[in-house]
Amino acid sequence: MAGVHIAVAAEAMAFGVRAGADPKALYEVISGSAGSSWMWNNRVPHILNNDYTPLSAIDIFVKDLAIVLGTGHKLNFPLPLTAAAHQQFIAAAAAGLGRVDDSAVFKVFQKLSGVSINQEEEGK
């Protein structure tokens, strides 16, 4: 579930910013709501600080989610949320982010939506 949590946290941040929310205010509101999770509270600060120093890595979630999906396939069990998250991590790895922190999956949503949280990122 960690990979899905990280992907949805990145998606929520990009969506909220696109809707006009202040990134730090959005983080605080969700942190105090039922939508919060350990992954939200741990990974979103990396996004807000543009700090993708690897504590874990995109490539790890590409591998781990592939294992989960393979098991689901063997059991003939649908895993649509896992599959969607896996595709976002694959996109991040394909963009050259495989060895950076898994929270950098946000950069996929950033690229797709055109949102920017940090001024340093605006030209990227």
Feature names for model-found ranges:
Residues 22-32, 83-87:
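Beta-strand segments within the central parallel beta-sheet cores of soluble alpha/beta enzyme folds
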